[in-house]
């Protein structure tokens, strides 16, 4: 008894011991796991800077392009367009600045300031003043059939530099829309006497339509386009009005809409003018400071005014007017034409100098049209990396190229243009009877093939008729007709497959010669009846199973059954035979 009790105690103690060991292992395992995975959790919680940038950049790009695309898709009225901040706001992170598409403002008023608790006034004059600009904006931006999925094109990069490039293009595009929408033709906020190439604010801030430019990514992009024409034409470089506009007090459009720039490389002008640059001549304020009097100076610019102050400060290291230098900068050989500060006295054949004076009339007809109009953007010659290495944001280092393979707007423009062009071509073809639609083309091809088939079938029928006619003539010449020939065929021994009824699936099953096993097939009626009774007796089937069927049908059924047995026996499909072959 004591031994039994001791055994029970040992078992209970052992069980308790193993339970304790089990729980202790679980506890230590949890502690080890927490200690071991601590660094991983820490790494997971504090992502790498590049990973954070990727997530942030995706959200930012989607947000910015959502706003941009929503601008183009929204149906808006003229008054909403002119004075509503939701179309003029550049802050792309403002999620509340855009409302639903279905919400439309009252067309009888213009919203002046959304932040002033919907304070509205009648401003018909301001609305009408921007009418042409509104029409142009709708034409170029409101017909785009963009979808948010297209923004995924900008998220396929694998490094920070690619996203930065896309970011620059996005900012440039947003700024272009903003300046196009908010260009003011009045002179209230003019900064014509801002004598700084860096555009330091003259009166504290530089404004666009009563809005500060502090949230702009950079000043005065050469991508500012305003492709419209009207009484308030803001494009200063067309051949009809550029001289007058750049001579007026309000010439800030020469600065804001600086479409041409020396960084863009040579333009396709005629000989001796091929590298000509616009009046602003690589600087922003030259429309103010060069009074369009370049051609009135002497040849060597001895009486050059003190406008050198309007260049950047590093230009002041030279005495004003360059008069202390020998005429022609003889200190430099004339072959050194690439010196950035030599005066413009080289022969006219030296057209590659970036700062050559404008020695031809301002109404020269081929200045803009030869390169595609005032909105032409030639290829960029400065590397994109200079944009990120330029702390001063100098304008000649900040220009970004318009790469059609990465410019979402250009791609959408081309796609929409091709789509509309295909619609027009299809419509014209349908009107003219030319089938171009895919479905109609398939039908047309089918009709052609059917016509060809019918033609070939007709030829075949003709040949068959001719063959039949010749065969009948042959039979007549040989003294027998078709019936005699058929009877002779039936009397002959046949090795063909026997088909029963209209169901010819047995033709693929019974390959043996059935005539050798059923000699009664072509026998007389008495023998046929005897054979039928024999089959019935051998298979133990009574005629009551077929009370209504004829003897012919009865023979048909029995013969099929017997054929199946014979076929199974010859081909080894009998279950017993198959079993024996498999196991023995």
From Swiss-Prot:
Keywords: Coiled coil, Membrane, Merozoite, Transmembrane, Transmembrane helix. Residues 184-194, 204-225 have a biased composition (Polar residues). Its main location: membrane. Residues 267-319, 436-477 form a coiled coil. Residues 184-226 are annotated as: Disordered. The lineage of its organism: Eukaryota, Sar, Alveolata, Apicomplexa, Aconoidasida. This is Uncharacterized protein PFA0635c. It comes from the Eukaryota. It is found in: Membrane. The chain crosses the membrane at residues 15-35. One of its GO terms (cellular component) is membrane. It is a single-pass membrane protein. Signal peptide: none annotated. Possible candidate for an effective malaria vaccine as determined by epitope response in sera.
């Amino acid at each position: 008894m004591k031994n039994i009790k001791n055994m029970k105690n040992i078992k209970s103690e052992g069980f308790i011991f193993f339970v304790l060991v089990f729980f202790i292992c679980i506890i230590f395992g949890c502690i080890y796991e927490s200690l071991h995975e601590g660094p991983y959790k820490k790494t997971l919680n504090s992502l790498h800077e590049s990973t954070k940038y990727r997530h942030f950049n995706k959200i930012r790009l989607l947000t910015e392009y959502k706003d941009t695309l929503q601008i183009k898709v929204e149906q808006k009225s003229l008054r909403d367009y002119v004075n509503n901040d939701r179309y003029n706001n550049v802050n792309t992170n403002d999620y509340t600045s855009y409302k639903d598409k279905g919400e439309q403002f009252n067309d009888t008023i213009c919203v002046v300031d959304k932040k002033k608790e919907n304070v509205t006034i009648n401003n018909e004059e301001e609305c009408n003043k921007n009418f042409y600009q509104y029409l142009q904006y709708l034409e170029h931006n409101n017909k785009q059939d963009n979808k948010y999925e297209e923004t995924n094109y900008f998220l396929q990069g694998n490094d920070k530099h690619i996203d930065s490039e896309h970011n620059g293009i996005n900012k440039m595009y947003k700024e272009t829309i903003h300046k196009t929408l908010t260009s003011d033709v009045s002179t209230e906020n003019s900064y014509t006497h801002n004598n700084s190439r860096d555009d330091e604010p003259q009166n504290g801030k530089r404004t666009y339509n009563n809005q500060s430019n502090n949230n702009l990514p950079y000043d005065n992009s050469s991508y500012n386009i305003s492709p419209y024409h009207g009484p308030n034409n803001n494009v200063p470089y067309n051949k009809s009005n550029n001289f007058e506009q750049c001579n007026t007090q309000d010439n800030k459009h020469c600065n804001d809409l600086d479409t041409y720039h020396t960084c863009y490389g040579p333009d396709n002008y005629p000989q001796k003018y091929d590298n000509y640059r616009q009046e602003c001549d690589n600087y922003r304020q030259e429309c103010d400071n060069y009074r369009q009097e370049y051609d009135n100076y002497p040849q060597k610019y001895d009486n050059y005014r003190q406008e050198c102050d309007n260049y950047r400060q590093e230009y002041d290291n030279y005495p004003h007017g360059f008069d202390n230098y020998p005429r022609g900068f003889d200190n430099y050989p004339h072959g050194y034409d690439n010196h950035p500060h030599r005066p413009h006295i080289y022969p006219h054949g030296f057209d590659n100098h970036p700062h050559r004076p404008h020695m031809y009339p301002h109404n020269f007809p081929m200045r803009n049209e030869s390169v595609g109009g005032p909105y032409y953007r030639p290829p960029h010659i400065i590397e994109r990396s200079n944009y990120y290495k330029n702390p001063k944001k100098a304008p000649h280092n900040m220009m970004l190229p318009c790469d059609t393979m990465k410019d979402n707007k250009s791609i959408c423009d081309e796609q929409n243009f091709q789509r509309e062009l295909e619609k027009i071509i299809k419509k014209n073809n349908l009107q003219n009877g030319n089938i171009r639609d895919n479905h109609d083309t398939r039908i047309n091809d089918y009709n052609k093939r059917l016509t060809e088939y019918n033609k070939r079938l007709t030829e075949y029928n003709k040949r068959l008729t001719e063959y039949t006619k010749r065969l009948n003539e042959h039979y007549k010449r040989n003294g027998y007709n078709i019936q005699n020939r058929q009877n002779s065929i039936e009397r002959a021994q046949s090795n063909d497959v026997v088909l029963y009824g209209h169901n010819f699936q047995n033709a693929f099953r019974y390959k043996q010669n059935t005539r050798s096993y059923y000699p009664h097939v072509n026998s007389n009626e008495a023998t046929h009846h005897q054979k039928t009774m024999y089959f019935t007796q051998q298979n133990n089937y009574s005629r009551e199973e077929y009370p209504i069927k004829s003897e012919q049908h009865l023979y048909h059924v029995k013969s099929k059954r017997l054929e199946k047995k014979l076929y199974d026996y010859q081909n080894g499909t009998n279950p017993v035979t198959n079993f024996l072959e498999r196991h023995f």
